[in-house]
């Protein structure tokens, strides 16, 4: 399909010929009429290794060459987006340059930041994580050089011919021979869109892909195209989506054995030296092997188990065993992977990702721990923090938000956590391995994934420990890639829909006018009932705020001509607002008076505005990486969850509280405006999206004392209206997430009054003035500890005296004591244990509200656990323990002597056995 889409005037004008590859059967375009292959590996081998196809360029030189070229050709250069895709709610990491403009620009909802534009966008893809270092070409992080044009029905920028022409011209500008370039046809499908595309080949290497996004799933009058069994139809917006691999262009310009040698020459040298293997790259035999390895890798799919097949092919070519080859080049491959991974981490941590067990934080920790595992094998001189810092310096510290000192602290803490994981992981894996071995089963992949996901235990460690236990595990070569794929996209659980079944009815209603935005200080209004069904009232306008953004709905009442109804919930469906009422019936067309619960509304406004202030204060105290993970506002108290790499200390909490209240006392105005999404993102950055990504071309921007967010809630008119902000507590709810609970305004005053009341009551109990309470409590506590020590000393002395006074009877040469003693259960256990350690048997009991009984046995014939169970049953209770020591009790104290007698008989019977 789409064959006609490739019949470009540019191809005809430049003398291109459309041919079919003799190896793969794909169509391609070439200036060389004698050519029979498409130019793509594996149809042809890499020919650029040792024979560069472009003039030599460093990474910086190639990036500037590309961006400058497109600037000269009418494109606007824009700055890169962060690698944490916080403007998206479906993916965590930026995986392509077009992801910068999805979903709103590509859907035509908002205009692009420039048109046409050019960008060099760092991207992170972890789906080939296991191949990095081993294939010679795979990377976790790469820069996608791109130029994009967004064509609309009213404005044509450029399309296919100009895109291919620009590609030709750029490749020629960096020294490429255009007669060696091929354009391979390859229809593109992704994310509900499709279109023709061409892959650009030279020297056996794909250096760019030119995608012409012009088809979508939305049905039109056009008959459509069948692609992979689905129908696609022409879109109104036609998008030029190009991607040139910066690192691949540099590799092809240098002809190095691997992409790592071309892109990271200084870092490869440093890590080789730190690992103590720098001499290997000085060996020409190794260089040849690495180049051959990369060539063969280009000829095959090396994912999964095929990595071993790659080893076999290279080993056969140089006539050594795969095992010997593995020993030779594995250390170098691990160095390559370490270099790649540390650049990936430089971008992740520099762009304020906090390692954790969720979202993008999970992926950061995945890369950190994989890097640490490889570094630990070398016992390197450099630390992980050292290497990441160096990568950040190479990229440019000005390219990152995060301070290097914070990055180092984050990394050092992750190193400590990893060491703890390894220490405790051995016992966990041993238990699992023994379980499967006992069942004569292999340890399945699902179990290994659970051990990694739940406990952080690396698969290599699992494999080694399982082998020692005699268990076999199923561990694929691409384990880390599978894990990364599992966690690369947001998996949202659908919230219960309160209005399920009403969609069609609501869609026919006009939008509700939102008075709560226009008149947030009002509490009464008049409106007309547009519709009423199933206890839901729809009005033409409303002051009632619907639940959303972590803010609960307003409550209140609606008064009609004949009845008054209580509004207990308010929800928004599209642009229509539904009021759930109880205790009344409203009629369509009826005019009603609405009354908001004033105290609740204003308390929610104060708490919502205070949430903004606390977030800003937390950033000021803890660092720029602070990002909201969740929030819930309430009239009495609220909470905000933030991403932070360690527990918040009491001192930090005090500083946050002071900073927040300073902002309140400054009485700065709260500014609310409606702004174009694209312009707002460019001006304020993606920290706008603290509470999620709202839809639409415009954003409601709320500015509160330095905090700027896209927010739909109700807010105070100035920070001074909030009143006091009091932090109630901080809680570590999960790794990398801290929860701050707080109260604002009157609620904060109520809380402080409550604390004062507790303090005053405590002072009354101790008969001291309130200001003398702390030293008095300290003195009492110190005295209590001294008295506790004295009591323990006296108790120990009582035990010693009791032991001295006891006269055991001898049964078969074994000293036996059966006695009631009025001591605490702890002392009973101590006495019984002391006697059993001398080879005797002691059954001791003490009365009280419930009877307590203990049996300690120094003779294997007397099983304490068995006997104590029977005795406790006599007392109406339960007991148990081990053969050497058991205890218990029961409420029937009057049967204590009976229990002791039965116990004595059981002991004697046991000791009389041979």
Curated annotation (Swiss-Prot):
It is an enzyme of class 6 (ligase). Binds 1 zinc ion per subunit. Zn(2+) binds at residues 608, 612, 711, 715. It is found in: Cytoplasm. Keywords: Aminoacyl-tRNA synthetase, ATP-binding, Cytoplasm, Ligase, Metal-binding, Nucleotide-binding, Protein biosynthesis, RNA-binding, tRNA-binding, Zinc. Its EC number is 6.1.1.7. SUPFAM superfamilies: Class II aaRS and biotin synthetases, Putative anticodon-binding domain of alanyl-tRNA synthetase (AlaRS), ThrRS/AlaRS common domain, Translation proteins. Its main location: cytoplasm. PROSITE patterns: AA_TRNA_LIGASE_II_ALA (PS50860). GO terms for cellular component: cytoplasm. Catalyzes the attachment of alanine to tRNA(Ala) in a two-step reaction: alanine is first activated by ATP to form Ala-AMP and then transferred to the acceptor end of tRNA(Ala). Also edits incorrectly charged Ser-tRNA(Ala) and Gly-tRNA(Ala) via its editing domain. This is Alanine--tRNA ligase. The gene is alaS.
């Amino acid at each position: 399909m789409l064959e006609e889409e490739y019949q470009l005037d540019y191809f005809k004008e430049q003398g291109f010929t459309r041919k079919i590859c003799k190896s793969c059967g794909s169509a391609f375009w070439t200036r060389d009429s004698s050519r029979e292959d498409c130019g793509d590996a594996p149809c042809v081998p890499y020919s650029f290794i040792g024979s560069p196809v472009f003039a030599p360029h460093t990474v910086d030189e190639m990036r500037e060459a590309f961006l400058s070229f497109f600037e000269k050709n009418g494109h606007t250069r824009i700055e890169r987006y962060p690698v944490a895709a916080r403007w998206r709610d479906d993916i965590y990491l930026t995986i392509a340059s077009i992801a910068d403009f999805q979903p709103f620009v590509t859907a035509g909802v908002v205009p692009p930041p420039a048109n046409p534009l050019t960008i060099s966008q760092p991207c992170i893809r972890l789906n080939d994580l296991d191949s990095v270092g081993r294939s010679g070409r795979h990377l976790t992080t790469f820069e996608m050089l791109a130029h994009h044009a967004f064509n609309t029905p009213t404005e044509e920028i450029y399309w296919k011919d100009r895109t291919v022409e620009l590609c030709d011209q750029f490749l020629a500008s960096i020294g490429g021979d255009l007669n060696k370039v091929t354009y391979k046809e390859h229809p593109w499908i992704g994310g509900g869109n499709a279109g023709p595309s061409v892959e650009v080949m030279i020297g056996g290497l794909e250096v760019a892909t030119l995608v012409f996004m012009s088809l979508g799933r939305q049905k039109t009058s056009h008959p459509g195209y069948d692609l992979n069994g689905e129908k696609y139809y022409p879109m109104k917006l036609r998008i030029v989506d190009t991607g040139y691999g910066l690192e691949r262009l540099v590799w092809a310009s240098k002809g190095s054995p691997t992409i790592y040698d071309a892109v990271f020459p200084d870092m490869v040298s440093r890590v080789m030296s730190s690992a103590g293997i720098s001499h290997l790259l000085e060996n020409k035999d190794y260089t040849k092997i690495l180049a051959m390895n990369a060539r063969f890798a280009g000829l095959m799919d090396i994912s999964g188990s095929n990595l071993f097949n790659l080893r076999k092919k290279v080993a056969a070519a140089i006539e050594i065993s795969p095992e010997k080859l593995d020993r030779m080049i594995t250390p170098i491959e691990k160095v390559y992977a370490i270099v790649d991974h540390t650049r990936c981490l430089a971008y992740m941590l520099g762009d304020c990702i906090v390692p954790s067990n969720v979202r993008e934080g999970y992926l950061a920790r995945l890369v950190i721990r994989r890097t640490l595992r490889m570094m630990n094998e070398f016992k390197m001189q450099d630390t992980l923090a050292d290497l990441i810092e160096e990568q950040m310096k190479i990229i440019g510290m000005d390219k990152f938000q995060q301070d290097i000192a914070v990055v180092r602290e984050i990394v050092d803490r992750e190193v400590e956590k990893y060491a703890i994981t390894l220490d405790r992981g051995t016992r966990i894996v041993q238990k699992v391995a023994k379980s499967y071995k006992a069942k004569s089963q292999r340890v399945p992949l699902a179990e290994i994934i659970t051990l990694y996901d739940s406990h952080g235990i690396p698969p290599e460690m699992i494999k080694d420990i399982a082998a020692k236990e005699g268990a076999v595990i199923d561990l694929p070569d691409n384990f880390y890639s599978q894990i990364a794929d599992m966690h690369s996209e947001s998996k949202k659980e659908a919230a219960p829909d309160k209005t399920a079944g009403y969609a069609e009815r609501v869609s026919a209603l006009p939008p509700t006018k939102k008075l709560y935005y226009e008149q947030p200080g009002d509490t009464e209004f008049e409106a007309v009932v547009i519709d009423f069904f199933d206890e839901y009232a729809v009005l033409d306008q409303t002051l009632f705020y619907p639940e959303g953004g972590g803010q609960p709905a307003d409550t209140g009442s609606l008064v009609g001509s004949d009845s008054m109804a209580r509004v207990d919930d308010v929800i928004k469906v599209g642009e229509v607002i539904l009021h759930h009422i109880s205790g009344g019936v409203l009629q369509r067309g009826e005019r009603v008076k609405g009354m908001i619960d004033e105290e609740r509304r204003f308390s929610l406004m104060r708490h919502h505005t205070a949430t903004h202030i606390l977030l800003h204060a937390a950033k000021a105290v803890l660092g720029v990486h602070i990002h909201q993970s969740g929030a819930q506002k309430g009239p009495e108290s609220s909470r905000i969850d933030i991403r932070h790499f360690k527990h918040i200390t009491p001192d930090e909490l005090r500083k946050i509280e002071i900073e927040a209240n300073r902002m309140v006392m400054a009485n700065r105005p709260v500014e609310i405006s409606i702004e174009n999404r694209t312009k707002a993102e460019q001006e304020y950055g993606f920290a706008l999206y603290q509470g999620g990504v709202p839809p639409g071309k415009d954003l409601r921007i709320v500015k509160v004392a330095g905090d700027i967010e896209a927010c739909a809630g109700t807010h105070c008119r100035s920070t001074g209206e909030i009143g006091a902000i009091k932090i109630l507590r901080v809680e570590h709810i999960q790794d990398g997430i801290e929860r701050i609970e707080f109260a604002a305004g009157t609620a904060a005053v109520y809380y402080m009054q409550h604390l004062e009341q507790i303090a005053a009551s405590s002072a009354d109990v101790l008969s001291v003035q309130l200001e003398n309470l702390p030293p008095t409590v300290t003195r009492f506590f110190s005295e209590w500890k001294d008295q506790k020590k004295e009591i323990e000393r006296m108790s120990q002395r009582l035990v010693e005296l009791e032991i001295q006074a006891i006269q055991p009877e001898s049964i078969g040469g074994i000293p036996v004591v059966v006695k009631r003693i009025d001591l605490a259960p702890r002392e009973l256990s101590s006495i019984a244990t002391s006697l059993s350690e001398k080879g005797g048997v002691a059954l001791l009991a003490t009365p009280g509200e419930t009877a307590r009984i203990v049996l300690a046995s120094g003779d294997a014939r007397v099983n304490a656990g068995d006997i104590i169970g029977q005795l406790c049953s006599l007392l109406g209770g339960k007991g148990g323990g081990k053969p050497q020591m058991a205890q218990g009790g029961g409420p029937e104290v009057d049967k204590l002597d009976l229990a002791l007698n039965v116990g004595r008989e059981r002991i004697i019977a046991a000791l009389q056995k041979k």
